[in-house]
Amino acid sequence: ATGIEWEEYAAGAEYAAEHGELLQPGALDAIEEYGWALKGPTATPIGKGFRSINVQLRQRFNTYANLRPVRTLPGVPTRFENVDLVIVRENTEDLYKGIEYMLNDEIANGVKLITKPACERICRFAFDYAAANGRKKVTAVHKANIMKLTDGMFLSTFREVAKDYPAIEADDCIIDALCMKLVQKPEQFDVLVAPNLYGDIISDLCAGLVGGLGFAPSANIGAKTRIYEAVHGSAPDIAGQNKANPSAILMAFAMMLNDLGMTDKAARLNAAILAQVAEGKAVTADIGGTATTTEFTDAVAARL
């Protein structure tokens, strides 16, 4: 037992279809009051409809840093054996600010909003994380060769902040070149810090390097609020069928336990997940098994 008392609230497209609103009343107030939340995957319509709940939560609570650890796991089929990197994604700005409008019937415009305070805040977060967790290098991800003002500001701010951390190696990589290098030799990277859009894209790419989104947890971190979740989406094609791999949300919960100071419980939960996957029995279909979500979760729980 963790000693955590839970309050549960519904959210997402299915809830909205029935109730006309994205979040059950009281959810935002509860997050505001407690400052900690574990969030399940929610669907967002493509090309129309309401804005992403994730984006709204991040902007409402100013959870400016999205922390996404990526590492190779024993028992998970992958092309790479020694991946161990962390993505630090700026969570509140860039094209994900959601500022879009029609100039006329044939021209749509989206605003890429980048501010120096947000750039400095996320870069400093990345270096502080590296220093606190024994990481040796931080790489800035950008396209400053083309977007000289927006990404240029991100890169120049990164270089300014890096001067305050002489013990940590700092370099940068253009986003398209980074994608190539990640699929060639991912072990060359340690901590990647990126604006919102690039961070989102490389998060999924890196998850693919270690076996897929089923093993990708994340934490949305602000000054007063932390929201933990799986990187993957709601997978509507298997929703309600008891087929999904719950590892990512369990690993996100382990991140939460660790940040709450329950480091022993976090380590035990992570070890139980890894042991279950490595054994290869009672695992879900995405990694070659036949177990249901419930069966996998029960097997992990039995190891605790």
What are these model-predicted stretches?
Residues 73-99, 113-118, 233-266:
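Short, glycine-/small-residue-rich phosphate/pyrophosphate-handling segment
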Residues 286-304:
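Short, amphipathic C-terminal "tail helix"
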Residues 3, 33-36, 58-66, 93, ...:
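Generic secondary-structure signature for well-ordered alpha-helical cores
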Residues 1, 104-176, 188:
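Glycine-rich phosphate/diphosphate-binding loop of Rossmann-like nucleotide-binding domains
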Residues 2-15:
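A short beta-strand-loop structural module common to alpha/beta enzyme folds
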Residues 13-16, 25, 181-281:
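Glycine-rich phosphate/nucleotide-binding loop
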Residues 17-112, 197:
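N-terminal glycine-rich phosphate/adenylate-binding segment common to multiple enzyme folds
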